[in-house]
């Protein structure tokens, strides 16, 4: 066949598609477009078969979504070529010509060629194949063979086996998507709460004879009319979303990728507000719809299961006058119990906690709660009985996180705490949160709960120890509920959240000291992280100032626990062992300071004495130690702890003026990174060259301390983390010692150093490209010295610190200390610097502009 024979078919098809899409843009109704696209392809296939006929006696059938009568703009065209017998040579040739022509038409066929017996074999082996074949539709060829096929598929269908298989398949699919509809980039088709879940319900219902659409399923008694309406609306919303994704990307794309979300928001007419991005508002709508589907999915599947696998109610066991255990699930005794007594809407969750043998709630209970949620109103919230019940839920020894999640899914928690409703499904495009605000909040509570469990004590030894000594753990859960509750409102979310927490504490009758603790935790929940990661913990004044802010040991314990739980609940990328050590160091230092603040001279003396003790253990004579220490000023001893001072001294006391750079490296104490010491003659570009080396090794600098001895030698210390965990840190340490020393030696010799950055580092994540952080640089004089404090915020990228180091070197700015805080794809770094350009307003402004250019990548 001549390919030019296909041109008229292709042109008619493309013109009809364009007209259908233009019509969709006018009315925005998904079903007419999906049906019209299906009709267009049906006609194109029939036209094609006039040129490329089927083998004699064969049938061409649409299967899968196409067989269902729905075709998305860029979906595969799923076809079954059904043969009456095994194909011979001419049959195979005809099929090859037909399939090649389908590709030439631009249809991207997903095709299979089978006999009737092969269809039955494949359907028995694979539930996905069986499901696709169930949704078959005759297109052309032998109608009698199609009838035989339909009869065979119907005859072999076992509703019970089909239900079990589809439920397992759905559970496996949900697991691939982390069992949550709240993914950052959800798949509108496959993610929990998406289109596939709706299709699974209808497949199960159809196999069991309960109907093919929502109206029929409702008439069969599996759904109420309002539930059917809600599911129909959600289905239409997801269908339109999938259509828009295909049209926007011009390919089969079902994921709401970061770079598509802003454009999709425009398509939907969603505008950015003063406090929320348009993309965040779009995603909140998506999450609300997915939550609805997820909840009704549970109810429907239970209802179908009860119809297919009826069990007697003789095993029901009364729990109290309102609830019973039925088949291991919490069941209501009377249908109208929540309408008669709305307080039971909270007590149901308390009963779940108090009866751990219950595997869940029955469909009847879930449905009754769902439909009675409107009974939680202002009067309900003011009821002292309900307030007491809510606190009891938080005070239980088990099931707190499970029930809070269930309360959120059933819309009970958002109705009881209206301020919580605002954050349900609220995405945070801040480059370090990977959960919606409500899911992050529940993750923080989960982390706090783990601190109370002996089986997790080895994961968080200090946190578990601190939690064991803390009274009234539930106060931490209240603080966690409110710590981010004001996100998206504008203003300081910590301050606004503290006011909400104070109001909650007053309304729920918390003791004054407990109310004050909760309010403090919400207001200061970012404090400990900021001090640990941005301030010099070796400075006694920093510790004393933090101790004054936390006031006492109870506040310190609670803040430490909330901080660790908060960071760990933000993103797997944000937490690392180094941050854990910083927080632990700050906790221990502050605990000591709360026992009595120490002045600088006392701390200095104790630090030197401890370093001297360590050096004696290493066999170093006191006179050798003192000779080296005379090269160092007070600032050095305040900037390093005793272990670091002893380590430096042990390697440098005999080479105070070396003829080449000295580099020593050891694994960090917590075992995740490297501690690096550089000792060499000081030069303006030393820090820049060191950063360039780290950048080339894909090392992330966490901490930098820059010191110059009285004789002009640089003694610099770094903590770096590798991009990926290293199997042998000691081998890496030896390699760095050699390579970095050689690089610095070449630089001092005047050699022009090549850019060693490796190619895979020169990339940014998609989210950071779509939602970049506005570069910021703030320069303030350091209140207790002659130096300056430079605070920068920007999107993280390869070579960022190297670029800043270059700006400092070019402007004659000396780096004294750097504290690097990386939060996912966002950096918040602090540099203590000095230099003549910082003393004059004009040159200071020029320096700030150069820093901003470096942050922006210009």
Curated annotation (Swiss-Prot):
Cofactor(s) listed in the protein's UniProt record: Mg(2+)
Entries under Pfam families matching the protein: ACT, GlnD_UR_UTase, HD, NTP_transf_2
Gene Ontology biological process terms from the UniProt entry: regulation of nitrogen utilization
Keywords, sorted A to Z: Hydrolase, Magnesium, Multifunctional enzyme, Nucleotidyltransferase, Repeat, Transferase
Reaction equation(s) it catalyzes: [protein-PII]-L-tyrosine + UTP = [protein-PII]-uridylyl-L-tyrosine + diphosphate; [protein-PII]-uridylyl-L-tyrosine + H2O = [protein-PII]-L-tyrosine + UMP + H(+)
Sample GO molecular function, one term: [protein-PII] uridylyltransferase activity
Keyword Repeat part of the UniProt annotation: yes
Record has DNA damage as a keyword: no
Regulation: Uridylyltransferase (UTase) activity is inhibited by glutamine, while glutamine activates uridylyl-removing (UR) activity.
Domain of life from the UniProt record: Bacteria
Domain ACT span(s) in chain numbering: 675-756, 789-858
SUPFAM superfamilies linked to this entry: ACT-like (SSF55021), HD-domain/PDEase-like (SSF109604), Nucleotidyltransferase (SSF81301), Nucleotidyltransferase substrate binding subunit/domain (SSF81593)
Gene3D superfamilies attached to this UniProt entry: 3.30.70.260, Hypothetical protein af1432 (1.10.3210.10)
Segments forming domain HD: 437-559
EC number: 2.7.7.59, 3.1.4.-
Residue segments, region Uridylyltransferase: 1-318
Ranges for region Uridylyl-removing: 319-674
CDD domains in alphabetical order: ACT_ACR-UUR-like_2, ACT_UUR-like_1, HDc, NT_GlnE_GlnD_like
InterPro entries: ACT-like_dom_sf, ACT_dom, HD/PDEase_dom, HD_domain, NT_sf, PII_UdlTrfase/GS_AdlTrfase, Polymerase_NTP_transf_dom, UTase/UR
Family designation: Belongs to the GlnD family.
Domain note: Has four distinct domains: an N-terminal nucleotidyltransferase (NT) domain responsible for UTase activity, a central HD domain that encodes UR activity, and two C-terminal ACT domains that seem to have a role in glutamine sensing.
Stated role: Modifies, by uridylylation and deuridylylation, the PII regulatory proteins (GlnB and homologs), in response to the nitrogen status of the cell that GlnD senses through the glutamine level. Under low glutamine levels, catalyzes the conversion of the PII proteins and UTP to PII-UMP and PPi, while under higher glutamine levels, GlnD hydrolyzes PII-UMP to PII and UMP (deuridylylation). Thus, controls uridylylation state and activity of the PII proteins, and plays an important role in the regulation of nitrogen assimilation and metabolism.
Protein's name according to its UniProt entry: Bifunctional uridylyltransferase/uridylyl-removing enzyme
Protein species of origin: Bordetella avium (strain 197N)
């Amino acid at each position: 066949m001549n390919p030019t024979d296909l041109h008229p078919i292709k042109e008619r098809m493309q013109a009809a598609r364009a007209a259908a899409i233009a019509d969709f843009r006018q009315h925005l109704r998904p079903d007419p477009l999906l049906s019209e696209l299906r009709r267009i392809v049906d006609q194109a296939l029939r036209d094609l078969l006039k040129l490329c006929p089927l083998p004699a006696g064969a049938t061409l059938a649409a299967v899968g979504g196409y067989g269902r009568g729905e075709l998305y703009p860029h979906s595969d065209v799923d076809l079954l070529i059904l043969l009456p017998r095994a194909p011979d040579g001419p049959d195979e040739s005809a099929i090859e010509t037909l399939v090649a022509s389908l590709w030439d038409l631009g249809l991207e066929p997903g095709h299979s060629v089978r006999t009737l017996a092969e269809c039955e074999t494949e359907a028995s082996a694979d539930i996905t194949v069986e499901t696709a074949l169930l949704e078959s539709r005759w297109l052309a060829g032998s109608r009698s063979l199609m009838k035989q096929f339909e009869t065979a598929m119907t005859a072999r269908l076992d509703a019970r086996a089909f239900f079990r298989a589809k439920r397992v398949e759905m559970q496996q699919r949900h697991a691939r998507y982390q069992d949550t509809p709240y993914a950052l980039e959800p798949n509108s088709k496959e993610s929990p709460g998406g289109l596939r879940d709706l299709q699974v319900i209808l497949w199960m219902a159809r196999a069991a004879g309960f109907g093919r659409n929502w109206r029929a399923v409702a008439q069969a008694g599996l759904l109420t009319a309002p539930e059917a309406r809600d599911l129909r609306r959600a289905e239409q919303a997801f269908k339109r979303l999938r259509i828009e994704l295909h049209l926007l990307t011009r390919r089969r794309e079902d994921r709401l990728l970061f770079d598509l979300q802003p454009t999709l928001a425009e398509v939907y007419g969603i505008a950015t507000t003063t406090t929320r991005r348009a993309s965040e508002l779009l995603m909140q709508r998506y999450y609300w719809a997915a939550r609805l589907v997820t909840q009704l999915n549970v109810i429907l599947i239970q209802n179908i299961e009860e119809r297919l696998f009826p069990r007697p109610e003789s095993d029901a066991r009364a729990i109290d006058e309102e609830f019973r255990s039925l088949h291991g699930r919490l069941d209501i005794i009377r249908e109208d119990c929540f309408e008669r007594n709305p307080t039971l809407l909270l007590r149901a969750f308390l009963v779940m906690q108090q009866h751990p043998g219950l595997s869940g709630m029955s469909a009847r209970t879930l449905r009754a709660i769902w439909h009675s949620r409107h009974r939680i109103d202002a009067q309900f919230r003011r009821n002292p009985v309900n307030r007491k019940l809510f606190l009891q839920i938080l005070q239980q020894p088990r099931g707190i996180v499970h029930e809070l999640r269930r309360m959120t899914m059933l819309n009970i928690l958002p109705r009881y705490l209206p301020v919580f409703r605002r954050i349900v499904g609220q995405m945070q495009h801040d480059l370090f949160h990977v959960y919606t605000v409500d899911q992050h909040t529940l993750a923080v509570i989960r982390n706090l709960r783990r601190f109370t469990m002996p089986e997790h004590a080895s994961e968080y030894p200090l946190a578990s120890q601190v939690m064991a000594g803390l009274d009234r753990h539930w106060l931490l859960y209240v603080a966690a509920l409110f710590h981010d509750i004001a996100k998206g409102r504008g203003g300081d979310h910590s301050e606004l959240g503290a006011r909400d927490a104070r109001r909650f504490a007053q309304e729920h009758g918390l003791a004054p000291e407990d109310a004050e603790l909760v309010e403090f935790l919400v207001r200061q929940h970012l404090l400990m992280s900021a001090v640990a990661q941005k301030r010099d913990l070796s400075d006694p004044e920093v510790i004393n100032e933090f101790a004054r802010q936390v006031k006492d040991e109870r506040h310190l314990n609670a803040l430490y626990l909330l901080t660790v739980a908060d960071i760990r609940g933000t993103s797997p990328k944000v937490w690392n062992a180094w941050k854990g050590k910083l927080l632990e160091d700050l906790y221990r230092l502050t605990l000591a300071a709360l026992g009595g603040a120490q002045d600088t001279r006392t701390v200095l003396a104790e630090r030197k004495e401890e370093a001297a003790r360590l050096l004696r253990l290493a066999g170093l004579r006191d006179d050798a130690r003192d000779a080296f220490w005379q090269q160092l000023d007070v600032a050095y001893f305040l900037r390093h702890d005793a272990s670091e001072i002893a380590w430096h001294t042990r390697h440098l006391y005999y080479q105070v003026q070396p003829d080449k750079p000295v580099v020593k490296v050891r694994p960090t104490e917590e075992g995740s990174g490297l501690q690096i010491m550089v000792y060499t003659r000081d030069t303006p570009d030393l820090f820049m060259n060191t950063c360039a080396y780290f950048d080339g090794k894909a090392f992330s600098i966490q901490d930098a301390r820059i010191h110059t001895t009285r004789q002009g030698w640089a003694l610099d210390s770094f903590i770096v983390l590798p991009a990926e965990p290293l199997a042998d840190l000691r081998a890496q340490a030896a390699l760095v010692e050699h390579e970095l020393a050689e690089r610095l030696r070449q630089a001092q010799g005047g050699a022009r150093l090549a850019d060693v950055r490796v190619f895979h580092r020169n990339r940014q994540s998609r989210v950071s490209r779509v939602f970049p952080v506005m570069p910021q640089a703030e320069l303030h004089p350091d209140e207790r010295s002659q130096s300056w404090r430079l605070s920068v915020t920007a999107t993280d990228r390869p070579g960022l610190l190297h670029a800043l180091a270059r700006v400092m070197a070019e402007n004659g700015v000396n780096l004294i200390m750097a504290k690097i805080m990386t939060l996912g794809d966002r950096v918040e770094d602090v540099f203590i610097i000095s230099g003549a350009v910082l003393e004059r307003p004009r040159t200071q402004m020029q320096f700030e502009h150069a820093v901003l250019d470096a942050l922006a990548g210009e």
